[in-house]
């Protein structure tokens, strides 16, 4: 679907997500003005049809026709807070700001209230799709006033997998980022379940199980088929052993926020919480606890401990 080229949006933050989102919008005919403080990020988009990159924030603001629409794709916390403060001082009443980063929903509620006091509209947008979004479209969960979301609708329709599906006005300010937080918590649980299942398959070599073949087989007709499994089958077909990857899994803020939210609300979330703890353990955070456990067993039961310089059996 093509959109009115007179429609314009500013994309601020051109990393892996923001850069591809700018490309997708430009390819649908929406005029895009793009800026990032990093010159390499700007250079990567230079010359893209329908996309104008600028060198400074001042040029970025000046290039946008009023009332402006500015979409931020920045790390949560201080980078987003600082940028919103700067923009609030330079934009004019009636402009619309969209935070598409993985911000905490309470930060988004605070931003919405502060910007409204300056006459600015605000939408929080949880964005899912990763590096595949340019090709497949993005799943968008948005929060904010209905008038602001309606104004943003052509952009949401262009970014989504299809104009009618893949984006949702979830509720009031903060609702979009709350939905994205829970989405990422669910993602943690799903990924952990797949990882544990494939580890079990790998642990029984005497049965002749082929993890790559099973991953591909499970994609068709089974109750555990999913896009995550599609990706897993693809990389296992190339490298089923994965011995060049250290067994260390990073965790992002959303998994922690989801677990904390479950505690605050008294909502049982054992799978999400256990998946988060598994990531902590992979980062070496359980090493001291494991050593202490081994030493306790030796103290009360005389059980043997393994020397630190000896590899595990």
Predicted regions and their residues:
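Rossmann-like NAD(P)-binding element
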Residues: 37, 51-110, 134-143
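Helical "substrate-binding/catalytic lid" subdomain
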Residues: 141, 151, 164-167, 174-303
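Hydrophobic beta-strand scaffold residues
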Residues: 32, 53, 122-123, 269
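NAD(P)+-binding Rossmann beta1-loop-alpha1 motif at the extreme N-terminus of oxidoreductases
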Residues: 2-69, 94, 131-133
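Rossmann-fold dinucleotide-binding core
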Residues: 9, 80-83, 104-195, 201
């Amino acid at each position: 679907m093509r959109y009115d080229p007179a429609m314009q949006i500013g994309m601020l933050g051109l990393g892996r997500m923001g850069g591809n989102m700018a490309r997708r919008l430009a390819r649908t005919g929406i005029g895009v003005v793009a800026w990032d403080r990093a010159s390499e990020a700007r250079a990567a988009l230079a010359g893209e049809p329908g996309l104008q990159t600028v060198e400074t924030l001042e040029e970025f603001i000046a290039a946008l026709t009023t009332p402006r629409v500015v979409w931020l794709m920045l790390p949560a916390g201080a980078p987003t807070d600082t940028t919103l403060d700067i923009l609030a001082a330079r934009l004019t009443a009636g402009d619309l700001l969209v935070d598409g980063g993985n911000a905490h929903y309470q930060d988004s509620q605070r931003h919405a209230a502060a910007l409204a006091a300056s006459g600015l509209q605000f939408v929080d947008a949880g964005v899912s799709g990763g590096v595949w979004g340019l090709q497949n479209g993005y799943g968008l969960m948005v929060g904010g006033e209905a008038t602001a979301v309606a104004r943003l609708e052509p952009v949401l329709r262009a970014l989504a997998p299809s104009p009618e599906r893949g984006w949702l006005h979830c509720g009031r300010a903060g609702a979009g980022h709350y939905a994205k937080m829970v989405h990422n918590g669910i993602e943690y649980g799903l990924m952990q379940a797949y990882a544990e299942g494939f580890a079990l398959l790998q642990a029984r070599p005497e049965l002749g199980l082929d993890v790559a073949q099973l991953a591909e087989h499970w994609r068709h007709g089974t109750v555990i088929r999913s896009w995550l499994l599609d990706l897993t089958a693809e990389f296992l077909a190339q490298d089923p052993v994965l011995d060049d990857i250290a067994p260390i899994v990073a965790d992002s803020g959303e998994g922690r926020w989801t677990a904390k939210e479950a505690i605050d609300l008294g909502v049982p979330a054992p799978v999400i919480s256990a998946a988060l703890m598994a990531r902590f353990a992979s980062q070496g955070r359980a090493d001291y606890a494991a050593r202490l456990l081994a030493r306790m067993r030796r103290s009360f039961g005389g059980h043997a401990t393994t020397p630190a310089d000896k590899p595990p059996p």
